[in-house]
């Protein structure tokens, strides 16, 4: 009896302590001046950061982490929220989650013991897409609720779960909230903004999580895949499909064939908890499966990259805004179905309802993790160990193409059934040539090794284990030099390794057999190793050698080359290396003369057309050697001056942008800055003002800049975005007025034409290649067919459809525009523009730079009717007066991923 009283007393004291702690936690209204969810009220990031720090100071349930800088220099924060006892022991629980997540080095028995000891780790973020304002505000409210509530469910969650509340986009919240709250009249407040809500990527910041180009992506990936390895990742978004409140899991097919099945089953389990809670709380409007467009196929999203790391990724897309709105009538959403089990009726809607729904969903996820703590942790280990085992033996992933081959083998077996010797399954799924790879080797002697190092860093920043060769070695009969990288698939994150190197094999996902395709959510294929032009070898047997394991998360630098002794005639370096352009720009910025070698250096058999040459001088040597060492660029010394040479000089580069921002322009800005190209943003009003040649040598128009000509005047492709020169300036601050407007056929195109005729260079991508039709360049849309009645029409989607995929094209390396490029390269292609030349094209000096020479150019993804692409041209150079126009049908700057194509941009950026 006495012991019971003591225990009861301890529990009572603990509850009193928790209650006192909760009373000390500042409420959002005390800090912000309004309740989270109040109409017409948004918090800025400055206010949110201060509140997070107050929670950290006031509550022993909260620990704040500074996870790194944003692109605009703010600090990005994450809160760990759990019971006070767990907070005191966070490092131990982090170690348990890391160890189970990586799976190697422990036995099954040890894993079970760790799962029994550990705490489930759940990541919840908000604000990635800053105009989706529910996300940041549910994060604030969730932090407050977890730090202050003392109900039984909350205390059980805090005892069993470590909740990581991560802000995903500090800069975006500051921009959006400040813009919204600037208007004094609440009823006139709007979330429209003058520029992208992430400095470079805008909405595409949720497409960067296998490349990790952006600082915020790097910060988040480090926490997810190196520091914590949570079991659940919940990524909040907007907006829900019309006629619903929120879309969430389970998601529609297809899912990637490399996932562990426990990922998908675990996703279904969490999804059931989410839907169940909303329905039990009489909150209708949750849609799932085919009720929304979302799938689990794509890698690169904050949520989806988690699947490739054995993490259950949750996405919800919810309606709501600080400005009151409504749920409109969508009749076919009113009938209950498995996709929409509890429909919602049309009604008015306010911000508070969205916050309430979000809190319910968060608690559903956390309650699931709390109740299944042991299984969440052990399954993380089991999935990782499954990957280790699959990568350590012969294994055949069941890809759609392999199943198609199996069906063909069955048909062959039936036609020769009398032999009785056919075993189609064994023929396909035990074929040694079809085995999954066990090892990828990235040799250090490839032409552009610094770009290969960038690729390796993308792997490392996603938690992949990489080895480096400390000396020369041999594998599968081939010699490799020291410094080569070895990536084995016998590791927990094997799905991500395969996805970065191997083609994506998207199924023929049709509405019905022979019917139109169902568009993938985002891309169908993206293989980064292909897009970046990486040379690698794929081995189906394990490799041992003089290898050193790179510590998790330790990014690599290109090896500093050995610099030659002083040279009498100067120095050369390769045009095949992307980083060479960084070196060139460093030299030019210091006033040092740089030349290109149209025929290479005849005294160097390894030299190629377009290589760079710098004359000898003390200053040139100092700048060149410093920059080359920083960027991993090899330098050759010359004893005799090369000939012929062509001098290049810095150009005045203009990059089109618009009010509200352009993601394609933003990514191009990112690339220019990464490679030290100075530039100026140019907006439509400046173009319309004319006299462009006075200020600029080169103008870049990415997709969305140039409108299509009037219907019937050309074969223009793509919608463009333009044609309306004016725009209402009401509500737009004066400092942004110069950004307003659009490119028009009447005002803008004549000025661009004049710029070209006076010797300017224009580079266009995707829909902006419409400019060619405005200028009467003799090209046509190649993606048309002639019917029996002689009528020319576009292909239907059942005949031809290539969503985002990787296709191989030939490159005309004889042209200056393609100096440094290989004879073939991989393009990211998304129903992109494809051309054919008119009769007079050659006589007018129009040249093809890239084209499809085969009827099967698909390398990764999905391509219905790809045979129609044969002989289609996707990159063109055309003279216009004294200037040059470049047309790139695909986006060769796409999300700063296709490093293998960057030279097609860089070569044009000098005068």
Question: What are these regions, as identified by a protein language model?
Answer:
Residues 18-22:
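Sec/Tat signal peptide C-region and signal peptidase I cleavage site
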């Amino acid at each position: 009896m006495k012991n019971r009283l003591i225990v009861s007393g301890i529990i009572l004291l603990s509850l009193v302590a928790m209650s006192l702690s909760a009373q000390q936690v500042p409420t959002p209204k005390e800090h912000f001046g309004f309740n989270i969810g109040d109409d017409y009220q948004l918090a800025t990031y400055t206010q949110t950061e201060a509140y997070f720090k107050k929670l950290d100071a006031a509550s022993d349930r909260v620990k704040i982490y500074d996870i790194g800088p944003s692109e605009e220099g703010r600090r990005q924060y994450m809160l760990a929220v759990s019971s006070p006892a767990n907070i005191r022991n966070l490092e131990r629980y982090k170690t348990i989650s890391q160890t189970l997540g990586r799976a190697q080095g422990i036995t099954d028995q040890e894993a079970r013991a760790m799962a029994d000891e550990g705490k489930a780790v759940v990541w919840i973020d908000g604000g990635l897409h800053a105009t989706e304002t529910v996300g940041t505000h549910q994060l604030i409210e969730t932090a407050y609720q977890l730090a202050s509530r003392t109900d039984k469910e909350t205390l059980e969650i805090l005892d069993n779960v470590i909740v990581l509340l991560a802000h995903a986009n500090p800069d975006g919240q500051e921009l959006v909230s400040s813009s919204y709250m600037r208007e004094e009249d609440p009823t006139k407040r709007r979330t429209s903004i003058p520029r992208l809500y992430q400095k470079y990527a805008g909405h595409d910041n949720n497409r960067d999580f296998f490349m990790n180009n952006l600082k915020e992506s790097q910060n988040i990936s480090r926490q997810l895949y190196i520091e914590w390895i949570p079991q659940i990742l919940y990524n909040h978004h907007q907006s829900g499909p019309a006629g619903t409140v929120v879309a969430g899991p389970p998601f529609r097919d297809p899912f990637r064939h490399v996932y562990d099945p426990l990922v998908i089953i675990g996703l279904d389990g969490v999804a059931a908890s989410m839907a169940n809670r909303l329905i039990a709380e009489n909150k209708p409007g949750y849609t799932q499966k085919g009720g929304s467009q979302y799938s689990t196929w794509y890698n690169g999203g904050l949520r989806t990259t988690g699947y490739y790391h054995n993490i259950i990724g949750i996405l919800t897309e919810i309606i709501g805004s600080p400005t009151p709105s409504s749920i409109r009538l969508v009749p076919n959403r009113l009938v209950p179905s498995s996709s929409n089990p509890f429909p919602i009726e049309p009604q008015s809607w306010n911000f508070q309802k969205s916050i309430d729904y979000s809190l319910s969903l968060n608690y559903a996820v956390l309650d699931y993790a709390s109740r299944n703590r042991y299984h969440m942790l052990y399954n993380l280990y089991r999935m990782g160990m499954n990957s280790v085992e699959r990568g350590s033996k012969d294994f055949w992933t069941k890809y759609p193409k392999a199943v198609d081959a199996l069906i063909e083998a069955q048909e062959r077996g039936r036609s020769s059934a009398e032999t009785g010797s056919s075993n189609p399954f064994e023929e396909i799924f035990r074929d040694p040539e079809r085995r999954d790879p066990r090892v990828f080797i990235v040799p250090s002697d490839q032409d552009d090794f610094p770009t290969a190092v960038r690729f390796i860093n993308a792997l490392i920043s996603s938690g992949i284990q990489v080895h480096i060769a400390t000396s020369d070695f041999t594998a599968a009969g081939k010699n490799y030099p020291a410094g080569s990288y070895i990536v084995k698939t016998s590791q927990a994150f094997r799905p991500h390794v395969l996805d970065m190197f191997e083609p994506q094999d998207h199924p023929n996902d049709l509405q019905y057999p022979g019917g139109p395709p169902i568009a993938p959510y985002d891309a169908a294929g993206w293989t980064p190793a292909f897009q970046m032009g990486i040379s690698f070898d794929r081995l189906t047997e394990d490799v041992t050698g003089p290898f050193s394991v790179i510590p998790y998360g330790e990014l690599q630098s290109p090896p500093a080359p050995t610099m030659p002794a002083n040279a009498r005639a100067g120095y050369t370096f390769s045009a095949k290396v992307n980083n060479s352009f960084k070196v060139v720009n460093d030299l030019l910025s210091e006033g040092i003369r740089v030349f290109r070698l149209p025929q290479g250096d005849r005294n160097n058999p390894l030299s190629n057309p377009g290589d760079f040459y710098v004359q000898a001088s003390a200053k040139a040597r100092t700048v060149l050697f410093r920059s080359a060492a920083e960027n991993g660029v090899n330098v050759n010394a010359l004893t005799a001056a090369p000939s012929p040479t062509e001098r290049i000089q810095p150009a005045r580069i203009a990059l089109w942008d618009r009010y509200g921002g352009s993601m394609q322009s933003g990514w191009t800005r990112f690339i220019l800055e990464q490679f030290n190209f100075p530039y100026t943003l140019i907006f439509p009003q400046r173009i319309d003002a004319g006299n462009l040649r006075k200020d600029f040598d080169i103008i870049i128009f990415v997709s969305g800049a140039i409108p299509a000509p009037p219907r019937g005047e050309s074969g223009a492709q793509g919608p463009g975005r333009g044609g309306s020169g004016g725009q209402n300036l009401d509500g737009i601050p004066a400092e942004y007025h110069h950004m307003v407007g659009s490119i028009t056929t009447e005002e803008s195109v004549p000025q661009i034409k004049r710029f070209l005729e006076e010797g300017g260079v224009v580079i266009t991508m995707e829909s902006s290649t419409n400019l060619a039709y405005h200028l009467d360049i003799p090209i046509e849309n190649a993606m048309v067919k002639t019917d029996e009645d002689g009528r020319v029409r576009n292909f239907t989607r059942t005949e031809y459809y290539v969503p985002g995929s990787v296709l191989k094209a030939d490159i005309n390396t004889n042209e200056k525009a393609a100096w440094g490029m290989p004879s073939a390269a991989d393009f990211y292609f998304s129903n992109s523009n494809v051309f054919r030349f008119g009769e007079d094209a050659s006589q007018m000096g129009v040249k093809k730079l890239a084209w499809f020479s085969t009827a099967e150019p698909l390398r990764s993804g999905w391509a219905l009717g790809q045979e129609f692409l044969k002989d289609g041209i996707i990159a063109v150079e055309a003279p216009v007066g004294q200037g040059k126009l470049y047309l790139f049908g695909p986006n060769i700057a796409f999300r700063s991923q296709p490093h293998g194509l960057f030279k097609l941009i860089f070569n044009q950026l000098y005068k």
